[in-house]
Amino acid sequence: MFEFSRSSSAEAERPEPFSQEGPALWSASLRSWDLCFEMDEQDRVIRVGGRQAYRLQCAHGLGEQPRPFAEYLERRAPGAPTLAGLRRGERLDLTLRSDAAAPLTCRFQPMQPLDGLGRSLLLGMDISDLNWQSDSQQHQLQSLSLGKLILSRLRHVSHGHLAEAVQEILESLSGAFQMQAIALLLGDGKGFCTVFASHVRPGSDSLLRPPLQLADDDLREGAGARLLRRGEGASTLLRQIGEDALYLVPATMRGGRLGALLVRPMSLEQLAQGPAPQDWQYLAELLANQVADRCELHEQHDSSRKLGLLQEMIGGGWWRYWAEQELFELAPALHDSLGLTGEYRRVPLEHLQGLLQPADADELGLRLRASLRSGQALAQDLCLRQPDSRGERRWLRIEGRPLGRGSALGLSGVLLDISEGRRQEERAQAAHARLRSLIDSAPVVIYVQRVEQGHLVPEFYSESASNLLGLDLQGQSWQALAERVHPDDLEAFFARGRELLREGRVKTRYRLADGQGNWHWLYDEAKLLRDAQGLPSEAVGLWLDVTEQHLAAQRIAESEERYRVLVEDSPALICRYTADLVLTYVNRTFADSLATSPERLVGRRLDEWLAAEDASALRARLLGSPREGASEVPELRFNLPGQRFLWLVWAERPLFDARGELCEVQAVGRDNTPVRRAQQQLAQGAKMASLGEMVSGLAHEVKQPLHVLRMTLFNMRQRMNSVGLDGDYLGEKLERMDAQVLRVDRLVSHLGVFSRKSALEALPFDPYAAFEGALGLLGEGLRQHAIEVECPAPTQRMVVRGQADQLEQVIINLLANARDALLGNPGLASRRVRLEQVACREPGWVELHVHDNGGGIEPLLLERIFEPFFTTKAEGKGTGLGLSVSHDLVRNMGGSLTAANQGEGALFVVRLPLAAPAEAGG
């Protein structure tokens, strides 16, 4: 076996060596030298002794066989000769593997022969202190330099570039100590460490990269810096990372968290030449704590910024109260939100109470003292005296907990702005009160039934139940309610509950007895509500008393025959037709109006008797028919045989099937033919009355060209008696005479057209032509009365649809009224009438303006001027029909006639719809 010498007692226990040669030399060497090796000629160790032999590491399982001397070596001193030099008489400094933290370095003397069998004696003195002190100082200086680099590099780097700076530091460590990979891990305080930054040499493959995460227990496999190797016991850390060897340097950070440096060396020899474990420990703890402090500082700044932002957004913040000084310290945002001044944000309790409503201020003082006395939490809602910028009350919520004791006794907590919540709560309470009042006063009964194990248990009935049934249903069971159901309706009542639980919705009708025993027909509609898990929780429904509807249905059934007879014999024209205008029903009155029988009319199309325009409008209305209600058409004109016409005021109601599609239309017509004829006669009479008023002006208009003709004939006679008539002179006079004759002819023709009855058909025409025609008849008369007429040509010609002569009649009536108003005001310096065609802002319309400066219309009379027989003229000067007839004529063309005071006189506006583009183009 190998021999280890620690002392004389240890030597007595040492096994016998292989050889007994030179015992005196061996014994003397053991006492004088730190290490003694007996070597064979193949440089194998036979036995070991000396004062420091106990420090050598011993391999396991070697047995008693000689061991090569090289296995005892840790590393060779730089620049030393080889082992063979010892045999040549040279000295050599060697470092041997030691079982302690510090290596064992010895200076060996040249080998001395021990016997004649080739054995030698190798003697060494321990120089570890000298050698280790030199290496240690060098590594400490290098560690201090790297520590200075760490501090300077991390001092001013921003948090966003912190990982990059740490990576540069790790790269410097890797370059200084020849490492393949190095990583800094920081613990999260939850049992895990994460790689914060790392450096891996190019070309190396390593998992030591962010975001690798390791358990704290894996980094606590041993105490202090240590080398982990697969051959020296199992390591969970090595298996996780997939490395054969790692140098682990745990670092304890402030707060008890764990950090570490994980190093993958280039080789074990390079690691041995690097810093001592305590230097690695120094670098690891310095770097880990610096990085952790920077991260914690950033988190504190970020949390402070977020807290400040949150306090600013919610209008609140933290507070602290010192009981002995009765002084509040407020957060900056809270201090500013309360409108307080002062540098230190400290407010006396009395000052803070002055900001509150008196009742809240007194209560706050009492609650503060009670909380300090009992140690219980403080919570109160406070209302400020001053309203906010919107004039609304401002509410705060103060909450706090006692802290400290003795002179440091106080409270600390938060103060939040709950104004919006209080306003919403007040609105919700008001809405709840309104809703409760509405529910209680509603003509229906609202109820809630709770679902318990498949049963519907009554829970709530609105107060209207007592008004409807004369019963207090609150607290009554489902069985008590079922006993009040009519016996014939019990099956429907039971089926209602099953359908509600199965389908989630139900609608049914049944009879229920009230407090006096009278039966009420109830329409019951309910919906099932479910909880977050989708299970039925309660049913909400309503009862509607439909007793009157049932009685009405019975009465309707009894009188249906009477109503059918009434419809048949009704003086109104009643029919039904499909969306294609095919008649499906016609009453007797309608058939008689069309001079045929109802049977012969069924199946025929309604548009056979209608003009194309009316038929198209009727179809368009059917396409946009409302779902409910009837629509009334002003009039429909039916063309009857013998050039007869039937004017009907038409009211129609669309009927829809279950799918919401139009299936039929029911229409009722009222014969308006006599009224229509009377309107035509009235319009014609008004037209002739206008002609009568224009006689004097027309006489002058006819007399003037006749006078020109007379003068021309006189001149021709004089010329013929004196010098005779030549061709040129005669041609000139004849042309002049012809022009005057044409002038009279146009005037007479226009009078003939104007005096005829208006056509029934609406035709497209230019509305500006009404201005031209009216001025042709009234222009001369207006000029005779010194009335200036302005009629600018329109920038764009428009086309409307209607009767051109009727629009001209309207303009004539408006011009005549303007003339009378101007002549009835003798104080006017000038008399003006302006006719203008104006395009509307609303597309599809055009306006004709007639504006005078005659002083306008009294405001109280504006609403009555279109009434029949109403006039502002003196008695005997007007019929009161001009404006009324004009209003009806414009309305029949689909337009409107309005009057207003504007400027120095009255403004009449005729508003007409433009014709379709196809008609305008035609």
Swiss-Prot record:
Signal peptide: none annotated. Disruption phenotype: Mutant exhibits similar responses to carbon starvation stress suggesting that PprB-mediated transcriptional response is not transmitted through PprA. Residues 1-22 are annotated as: Disordered. It catalyses: ATP + protein L-histidine = ADP + protein N-phospho-L-histidine. It comes from the Bacteria. Its EC number is 2.7.13.3. PROSITE patterns: HIS_KIN, PAC, PAS. The modification Phosphohistidine is found at H700. Keywords: ATP-binding, Kinase, Nucleotide-binding, Phosphoprotein, Transferase, Two-component regulatory system. Residues 506-558, 632-684 form the PAC domain. CDD domains: HisKA, PAS. Residues 1-10 have a biased composition (Low complexity). Residues 697-916 form the Histidine kinase domain. This is Two-component sensor PprA. The gene is pprA.
